[in-house]
């Protein structure tokens, strides 16, 4: 099975999103290495009881992978919504 082409719509956004992920997951209580923020998925997987390992994880179910990705992505989305609401409230009525 081919791997998806995972590119952000905005060129160069990758580093900023990785920093954002690290910041959000640190606030959630996870130990995040700033040089390897993507590795937080292993800590999340361990907490959820998902046997995620570096390398091939073809033995994992979609549900298991979704639990890990959902925990990380959901936390990021909640923080983006919170930031947007904060910016809108600071802007005031138009």
Where are these regions (language model features)?
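A charge-rich, low-complexity, intrinsically flexible signal that marks solvent-exposed coils, linkers
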Residues: 1-94
């Amino acid at each position: 099975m081919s791997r998806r082409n995972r590119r952000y719509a905005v060129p160069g956004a990758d580093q900023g999103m990785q920093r954002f992920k690290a910041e959000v997951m640190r606030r959630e209580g996870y130990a995040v290495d700033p040089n390897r923020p993507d590795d937080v998925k292993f800590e999340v997987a361990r907490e959820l009881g998902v046997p995620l390992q570096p390398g091939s994880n073809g033995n994992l179910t979609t549900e298991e992978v979704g639990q890990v990705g959902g925990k990380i992505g959901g936390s990021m989305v909640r923080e983006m919504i919170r930031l947007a609401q904060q910016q809108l409230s600071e802007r005031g009525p138009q």
